[in-house]
Structure formats: C-alpha cells, structure tokens
Amino acid sequence: MYSILRRAAPLRRRAVSALAAAVLRREEAAAEVVVSRRATIPAAWFHSSPAWLGFRETGAAGAAARPQYAADEGLFYEEDKRGAKAGGVAAGGAEEGLEVAKLGISPKIVSQLASRGITKLFPIQRAVLEPAMQGKDMVGRAKTGTGKTLAFGIPILDAIIRHNEKNSPGKFPLAIVLAPTRELAKQVEREFSDSSNVETICVYGGTPISQQIRQLNYGVDVVIGTPGRVIDLLKRGALNLSEVRFVVLDEADQMLSVGFDEDVETILDRVPPKRQTLMFSATMPTWIQRLTQKYLKNPVTIDLVGEDDQKLAEGISLYSIASEGHAKPAVLGELIKEHAKGGKCIVFTQTKRDADRLSYTMGRSFQCQALHGDITQAQRERTLKGFREGHFNILIATDVAARGLDIPNVDLVIHFELPNSSELFVHRSGRTGRAGKKGKAIVMHSYQQSRAIRMVENDVGCKFTELPKINVEGSDLMSGGFDSFGGGGFGREGGGSYGRRGSFGSSSSRGGGFGDSGFGRSGGGFGRSGGGGFGRSSGGGFGDSGFGRSGGGGFGDSGFGRSGGGGYGDSGFGSSGGGSGRSGFGRSGGFGDSGSGRFGGGFGNSGSGSFGNFGGNNSGQSGGFGSS
C-alpha cells in the first residue's frame, strides 16, 4: 500500500498530506509491512556509460590516476551516452557554466530545474559533478553562497530516480544528508524536493517526533536532518540506515562547533561501509581531517577557496563605517535607507538580547523582525517565511542565521557589531551576493576598531570602502540610542524603558523602567525619579526584597503597598494617598512624571491624577483619569 501511495507523489511534499494521513490511519496495519528492495544497488547505477565505473576506484593505480578538480578546469564527461566529449570546453566554457541539459541526467530533473530558471551550473557545481557522478568520495572546500547544495543533490537525485524507475520503491532511505542547523536542513530539503519528485523528509528538533516517525514508516528516499534528531530516531528504531548508499555532511565544520561531532561519528558507524560519502566544509579543522581519514576512501579533494583566494563569493561589495554606540541605531537606519533601497536586508548582532532590543528600536521606522535561538521553532519558521515572501524587509539576527540559510535576493548585510572572527564575517556576508547575484556588506565599527578592520581585510583578502560619517542629530532613532538600553535588563540609569529617556515620559531621564540589573533599579517605577512601582530604591515594585521595598511601593511591600500607599490594598483604591498605590502606581509620578498625580489618589478624586497621565513634567496634576 505504501508503495502505491508513494507513486502518487507529489500529493505529499515535505509532510504527510491530510489525504495521505487519512489513508495511513486506515491502513496502519498494512503500513507495517516492509517491501524489501531487490538485489543490492549496483555501484555504478547512476552512470549511463557502458563502461563499469565501480563505486570507488581502489588500489594504487586508481589512486595515482585520480585527478584533483578545481573551478577553472573544464569538467565534462568522457564520451558516452551523456553526449559530452572530453576536452570539449572552450576557453570561455568555465566562465559560461555547464548546461544542465547536457549532463545526461534524468529529464525529470532537467525539467524541474528549468522551471526554476536553472539551466547552467556555477563553478562549485561543475567541479563537484564529475567525481560525484562517478561515485567517488569527496571533500569539498567551497565559498559560501555558491550553490553547493544543488551540486551534490543532482547526482543523488538522478541515482534515486533511475533506481525507482527500475525497482519498486522501498521503505528505507537511500541517502542521508546531515546539517548543523534546522534552517540549513530545511533549505537542503527544499532544494531536493523542488528539483525532483523523490520522497524526502526533514528531521530536526523543536517539532513533534511522532509526525516524523509516521512519515518514515510511510517510506522515504532521502533523509535530511540535524545529527541530534537523527540519533533520537535511531534510538527509537524509527530510522533504518541499512540501505543508505549516499552520505552527505554539509557545513561539517559547523557541526563540530555546535557539539555534534560525536553524533556524526555515531551515524557514520551505522551506515553501510559500501557507500559514497561527500563532505563539504568552509574550513578544515583537525576533526574534519580525522573524519576524512577514518570514513572516506581515497577521497577527491576540491578546493575552491585556496589559501590566497578571496573567500567571499564574487559580486559582494564591502563597506565599513565608524559609529559610536549611542548613535548606532540612527546610523543603521540611514544605511538601510541608502543601500537597501527597499530591498531585503539582514542585520547581524552579537547577542539575542541585542537582536530583540534593536528590533524594537528599529520597529519605530521600519518593518523588521528578530531571529535568534530563543524564538520558538514555529515563530522562527513564520519569521523566515515572512522575510522570504516580503512581508517585512529587515531581519535582525544572531549568528544562528549566518550559516546555510537560503534567503533569495538579499540586497544588503549589515554587521551591527564587528564579527568575532574573519571566518564569521565571511559566513555572515555570504547571505548576500548568492548564486552569482550582486550584494553589499557593511561593517559598523567604533573608531578604536579600525585596526580590526585591517585584520579582516588581510585574513579574507578583501578591501573595504570606508563610508563617510553620517550626521544623525535629531533622528527619531537617537532617543532610542542603543546604549540607553543599558546593561542587565531593558533599561539602565540614564535610559528609559525600552530605551526611551525617562521611560513612559518622565522628566528626569533617570532610572529606567524594566531597569538595570533586574526589572528596574535606581529610581524605578516605569521610569521615574525616586518613585515606586516596578522598581527599586525608594519604592520599587518588581524590585528588591519582594514586590517593593524602601519607601513603599506599588505592588508593594507588606501587602501591595506600604507606608501610606494605597495600591490594590491599603486604603482601598486610593483613599488618602494614592490611587492604585501611593509610592507605586501613584505617588510622585507612578507611571512616569515627576510631580504628577501626587496625594489624592483614587480614580477620580478631587485633585487626584493618580497614574500621572503617563508623563509630562507636572502633567496630570489634579486630573489624570478624570477628576474635577
């Protein structure tokens, strides 16, 4: 039954459709039956040449004859049914790219790629294709953003399609692709499913594992996922790797950096020894070299970076600009207006907190969203979908988005802080200028970091154009200067709640709501000098020693208000001393203003003005929420 349903693809793509799910429930018992594949898949099943290619060349002779490929070589196949001739690349062939229609791959793939406007391959794709189609193990070092996903995808998809045309599709996967992040895994899965009708599944944490188990029971051709979730599925017995013939490690160095090294080795130990392994990495640390020696057999090395070559993709223009902290959001706004011109822009920050704060500040003038590790998976997917579809054009992200995300047509990347390493600069900047398109990357730095800019230039082999200083005095974003967020909470001395001076309108510009070192400190009360509520030091709810201390304070101390302060307690809703809490939501400003709403609380007692009219020096006195 599952075999019949699988041939009904693309009814189900990326997840089990409602119809398929209903059929699965009715046929649950039948779905447990595993249709074994026919004889072991031939080693050269993916090559239509009459010459037997073997899964790998072995022996000294084969190793000696093995070529090492580079981007500037004309990579066509030997004369065979694919129609290409050795040495048939003209001098400009490498520049023009290799035509997909001449590869001799399945017409289904050619048609799908053509529908996406892909008719030629870029250098990494051209360099990878020949050894991959010949079944050779491979280690590829490539520039970021040059389309390597399609490079290893085409040979795998072609192999699976040809196999399924000759054999009944089985239940267990023929290929597995490991990626360090869920975003990269989803990108790879999307590339595979958009290029053919093979059955794929993307597995990663943060989503119900039961749904992934059901889909695996249904039968898939390719598993793409993060090592952690793959290990979980293996432990549950839901994933069987006994028929895997292709293994891909994408962004392998990043799997090491996020702690997946042991999981990767466990997975490699579980796949059959007779397989083709393709590994791609921007860098080659010791762990990558050890993996190569242990798990790859006579691998072809493809280095499209080189020690002296520029590591950024071509077409990215680089700029730098000096800016001090308090003015940075305003400068950022001007950069976006000038260089993005309404197009897509990604702004990278160092921390999750900075991404949230900057998103809030920039949201006053731009359509933007934050993306970082604390955002739920569902929200992250909605954010990425909205950005791709143009519902908003500015994404403020941490480095979770710096590697592997395929977001088309990003016009501008801005490094809000100088990256910690040249390598990180490359990965961040690689979000623009992808697949041969033009893009810009701008680094914002302090005047003291000019030397660090020179170091990046030396390491990467690039040159920044220094932009002139931008005058942002009077900008709407200056009042929400990044420094005003302060440290230890959304606010600090000198800056108000969410960065406004004096919070919700205080005259003192002191003691920021949502405070410093905890929800409000030093002058608390949603931004009031010396007043209570949500603060500390002379009355601060949500502050020190319970919900308020020292001088009585809204949501108070010792029973929602102390030392003469009404607040939801003492003296009711404010008789003789402050509606909703004297020295809290009431006295000396409560929600803001120095001198407003003092004495005479209540929601409308003569001369009251409790709540302080949300700000304004001396505003709300004898008034506020309606008194005569």
Swiss-Prot record:
EC number: 3.6.4.13
Motif (Q motif) on chain: 98-126
Region (Disordered): 496-548, 571-628
Keyword Metal-binding appears in the UniProt entry: no
Record-annotated Helicase ATP-binding domain positions: 129-302
Similarity annotation: Belongs to the DEAD box helicase family. DDX21/DDX50 subfamily.
Protein name: DEAD-box ATP-dependent RNA helicase 9
UniProt organism field: Oryza sativa subsp. japonica
Highest classification ranks of the organism: Eukaryota, Viridiplantae, Streptophyta, Embryophyta, Tracheophyta
